[in-house]
Amino acid sequence: MTSVVVVGTQWGDEGKGKITDFLSANAEVIARYQGGDNAGHTIVIDGKKYKLHLIPSGIFFPEKISVIGNGMVVNPKSLVKELNYLHEEGVTTDNLRISDRAHVILPYHIELDRLQEEAKGDNKIGTTIKGIGPAYMDKAARVGIRIADLLDKDIFRERLERNLTEKNRLFEKLYDSTAISFDDIFEEYYEYGQQIKQYVTDTSVILNDALDQGKRVLFEGAQGVMLDIDQGTYPFVTSSNPVAGGVTIGSGVGPSKIDKVVGVCKAYTSRVGDGPFPTELFDEVGNRIRDIGHEYGTTTGRPRRVGWFDSVVMRHSRRVSGITNLSLNSIDVLSGLDTVKICVAYDLDGQRIDHYPASLEQLKRCKPIYEELPGWPEDITGVRSLEDLPENARNYVRRVSELVGVRISTFSVGPGREQTNILESVWSNL
């Protein structure tokens, strides 16, 4: 067995797609295990950017299998659009496999997402309005429609009619909104199902067979640990489990078959939407980081909130996700700053704490305790080894590793594949 999990350690947008793409070169199967098209990842190949939301980053390797696992919620309309986009770019998708157990996002999920968010008023969570939460709600309530159901016209008709009856009562009676027509959904979405039918299978069999045969399998997480519904900044979280433990549920692969967990982080922190963010910057330094780092959401286009690197967050992520290796991205974005800061602990009502509180009220009162390091003026985008980094940048990388308590396997000085520097192979000793 040879398997590696890639997880985001912050609030998403850490560069997981880039690292997954990088590690995919030595994998034979690449699988996603949770989330939906609310998460976007950008891959740069030969200077060209590709933006994906559902399909795993490994799709760009035609000889490798890319898997959409059972833990995902799939909007068939978005998936077909993404497939067409790849085809137009000359990318084959013959290597894609979709779990027949994955749940389907339908228009009523998106409408319910919108209405629920509007009803919260000033207490909005900041959802992407992609229907993710309502789809997972239906899954937990055991009324969800799965990919396998979508492919069977009679079953899809029966379950869609049942669900629409219930949802329309909600829309009309609770939200004073307009009902959704069965006819507006049924034929269109059944046709989407037929367009993806060739890719649908029991992906748990594919993944376990690959591992049993000694093949290298890479699991690609979406969002980040701090958006995990159990371990994140609840309720400002996603509706699934991005933590490494989510792999076993979302892929049908047992925990004994997971070998390493790579935590991906940026040299600073960013967040989309509302919720606690102790190291958030509101000054010109924050604006500079946002602009240089192109911190705008892949899915929403919204400006991301940015702040200093938070080792409290990172140690929390390391603990709950069992991180064995770290990939540190976007060090180049900090170039040119006179000083750089790292949050080493929090001050909570005059007491120093080293853990991340569960209470939102406590988090609001947490003040970051910073360690300040000298910056570096040099352009480091051409650096190809740790030794080539300026001394101050090198010290920053080492200090991050010390504070998090995990060795750094790769560091990146730009978005390109060639700008990822290897300190040790993640696939070694497996």
Curated annotation (Swiss-Prot):
Q: What does this protein do?
A: Plays an important role in the de novo pathway of purine nucleotide biosynthesis. Catalyzes the first committed step in the biosynthesis of AMP from IMP.
- Provide the binding site for GTP: 12-18, 40-42, 304, 330-332, 412-414
Q: Which InterPro entries match?
A: Adenylosuccin_syn_GTP-bd, Adenylosuccin_syn_Lys_AS, Adenylosuccinate_synth_dom1, Adenylosuccinate_synth_dom2, Adenylosuccinate_synth_dom3, Adenylosuccinate_synthetase, P-loop_NTPase
Listed A to Z, the keywords are: Cytoplasm, GTP-binding, Ligase, Magnesium, Metal-binding, Nucleotide-binding, Purine biosynthesis
Q: Which cofactor does it need?
A: Mg(2+)
How is the cofactor bound, in the record's words? Binds 1 Mg(2+) ion per subunit.
The residues the record assigns to binding Mg(2+) are 13, 40
Q: Which residues bind IMP?
A: 13-16, 38-41, 128, 142, 223, 238, 302
Q: Which Gene3D superfamilies match?
A: Adenylosuccinate Synthetase, subunit A, domain 1, Adenylosuccinate Synthetase, subunit A, domain 2, Adenylosuccinate Synthetase, subunit A, domain 3
**What single Pfam family name could you report for this chain, choosing any that match?**
Adenylsucc_synt
Cell compartment(s), UniProt = Cytoplasm
The record lists the organism as Streptococcus sanguinis (strain SK36)
Which reaction does this chain catalyze?
IMP + L-aspartate + GTP = N(6)-(1,2-dicarboxyethyl)-AMP + GDP + phosphate + 2 H(+)
Q: Where does substrate bind?
A: 298-304
- This chain's protein is named Adenylosuccinate synthetase
Name of the gene this protein is made from: purA
Q: What domain of life does the UniProt record list for this protein's source? A: Bacteria
| EC number of the protein | 6.3.4.4
> How is this protein organized at the quaternary level?
Homodimer.
Name its GO BP terms in alphabetical order. Answer: 'de novo' AMP biosynthetic process; IMP metabolic process
